[in-house]
């Protein structure tokens, strides 16, 4: 798979090891003929050893054959997250360090999660594009401030903080993009 097609959460082969992509930084240096470079921050699967790799947009990283099992978040067992397969009810347990910053998007009963499995071993999760979270703490809206589009900080029910528009109040349910970590709208 070409470097410009790789997304956060993909599992790839790199330097003889298997890695899950956790973060991607894109840069377009001006003095290099417009070649776009990608810096991948990835963790070995299993093991969780961090590795950085910088690649050109046309460089290839072999995709790893894995099963993607549609699952629901069931519960947290100490530092481990337990997901239940939606078809055969197999429980998949992943440590908090494997989940990483995605833990801020996971709430009880969250559906649409794909657990990635290699040789019957869960190695990673891929979250839905957006999740619904509740705002638990945000400053009140300023009177007459609706004409401006100033964002304000909001603490969510998972402990995560994002920037939201001024009209969002405590107790509201909002959509959060799991790729960018940004406000994506009000939830229905």
UniProtKB/Swiss-Prot annotation:
<dbReference type="Pfam" id="PF08207">
    <property type="entry name" value="EFP_N"/>
</dbReference>
<dbReference type="InterPro" id="IPR013852">
    <property type="entry name" value="Transl_elong_P/YeiP_CS"/>
</dbReference>
<comment type="similarity">
    <text>Belongs to the elongation factor P family.</text>
</comment>
<dbReference type="GO" id="GO:0005737">
    <property type="term" value="C:cytoplasm"/>
</dbReference>
<dbReference type="InterPro" id="IPR014722">
    <property type="entry name" value="Rib_uL2_dom2"/>
</dbReference>
<dbReference type="Pfam" id="PF09285">
    <property type="entry name" value="Elong-fact-P_C"/>
</dbReference>
<dbReference type="InterPro" id="IPR020599">
    <property type="entry name" value="Transl_elong_fac_P/YeiP"/>
</dbReference>
<dbReference type="InterPro" id="IPR013185">
    <property type="entry name" value="Transl_elong_KOW-like"/>
</dbReference>
<dbReference type="Pfam" id="PF01132">
    <property type="entry name" value="EFP"/>
</dbReference>
<dbReference type="InterPro" id="IPR011897">
    <property type="entry name" value="Transl_elong_p-like_YeiP"/>
</dbReference>
<dbReference type="InterPro" id="IPR015365">
    <property type="entry name" value="Elong-fact-P_C"/>
</dbReference>
<dbReference type="GO" id="GO:0043043">
    <property type="term" value="P:peptide biosynthetic process"/>
</dbReference>
<dbReference type="InterPro" id="IPR001059">
    <property type="entry name" value="Transl_elong_P/YeiP_cen"/>
</dbReference>
<dbReference type="GO" id="GO:0003746">
    <property type="term" value="F:translation elongation factor activity"/>
</dbReference>
<dbReference type="InterPro" id="IPR008991">
    <property type="entry name" value="Translation_prot_SH3-like_sf"/>
</dbReference>
<protein>
    <recommendedName>
        <fullName>Elongation factor P-like protein</fullName>
    </recommendedName>
</protein>
<dbReference type="InterPro" id="IPR012340">
    <property type="entry name" value="NA-bd_OB-fold"/>
</dbReference>
């Amino acid at each position: 798979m070409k470097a410009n097609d790789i997304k956060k959460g993909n599992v790839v082969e790199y330097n003889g090891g298997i890695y899950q992509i956790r973060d991607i930084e894109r840069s377009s240096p001006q003095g290099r003929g417009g070649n776009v470079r990608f810096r991948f921050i990835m963790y070995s699967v299993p093991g969780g050893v961090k590795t950085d790799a910088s690649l050109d947009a046309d460089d290839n990283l072999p995709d790893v054959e894995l099963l993607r099992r549609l699952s629901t978040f069931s519960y947290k067992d100490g530092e481990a997250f337990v997901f239940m397969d939606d078809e055969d009810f197999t429980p998949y347990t992943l440590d908090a360090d494997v989940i990483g910053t995605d833990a801020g998007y996971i709430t009880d009963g969250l559906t649409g999660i794909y657990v990635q499995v290699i040789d019957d071993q869960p190695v990673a999760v891929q979250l839905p594009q957006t999740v619904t979270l509740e705002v638990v703490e945000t400053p009140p809206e300023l009177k007459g401030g609706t004409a401006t589009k100033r964002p304000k900080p909001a603490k969510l029910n998972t402990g995560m903080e994002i920037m939201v528009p001024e009209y969002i109040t405590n107790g509201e349910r909002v959509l959060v993009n799991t790729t960018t970590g940004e406000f994506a709208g009000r939830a229905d």
